[in-house]
């Protein structure tokens, strides 16, 4: 699950079972008309750091992080899920606040060890995200990207963090992160 992988590498994954259910006290009428309570459940699901298996699911309400990546239709028996690669998935990975938040948390995690230089941080990011070290060419390109981004992000309150968050988000959006070899 891509959502769980993003939470895990960012250090935000809450492995504990959540207490209660956001859907437990929901009025039946809310289920049919997607009212305020239904929207609240979607908001809870979109901001939760628990594993996806614990997300509150109501038949007609699927959290955005699951819907965009071929979540199985809840009203039907599904033995095999479709696997697609569509533009909405890339747009989600590049623009969704949830993904941006995980990228920023991951950037903070990569920047935390004070003893590391940027090349070592790039290798750390690659190990966390892709379970391998960066090649020499990837490391060189990443250092160039980070330098350019940091120089251009002078309006940001923390240009270094912004550059690393952007770098981490780019890897989160990569095909290599999304697909297991």
Per-region residue spans from a language model:
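An acidic, gly/pro-interrupted, aromatic-rich
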Residues: 1-133, 166, 171-181
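Short coil/turn helix-boundary motifs
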Residues: 114, 149, 153-156
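Amphipathic alpha-helical segments that form the core helices of the histone-fold
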Residues: 140-151
């Amino acid at each position: 699950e891509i959502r769980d992988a993003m939470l895990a590498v960012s250090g935000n994954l809450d492995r504990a079972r959540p207490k209660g259910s956001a859907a437990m006290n929901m009025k039946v009428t809310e289920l049919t008309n997607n009212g305020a309570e239904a929207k609240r459940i979607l908001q809870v699901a979109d901001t939760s750091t628990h594993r996806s298996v614990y997300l509150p699911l109501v038949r007609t309400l699927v959290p955005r992080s699951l819907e965009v990546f071929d979540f199985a239709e809840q009203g039907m028996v599904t033995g095999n899920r479709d696997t697609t690669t569509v533009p909405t998935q890339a747009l989600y990975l590049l623009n969704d606040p949830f993904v941006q938040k995980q990228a920023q948390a991951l950037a903070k995690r990569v920047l935390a060890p004070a003893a590391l230089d940027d090349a070592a941080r790039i290798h750390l990011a690659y190990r966390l995200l892709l379970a391998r070290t960066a090649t020499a060419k990837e490391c060189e390109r990443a250092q160039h990207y980070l330098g350019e981004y940091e120089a251009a992000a002078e309006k940001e309150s923390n240009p270094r963090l912004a550059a690393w968050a952007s770098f981490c988000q780019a890897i989160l959006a990569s095909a290599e992160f999304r697909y297991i070899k």
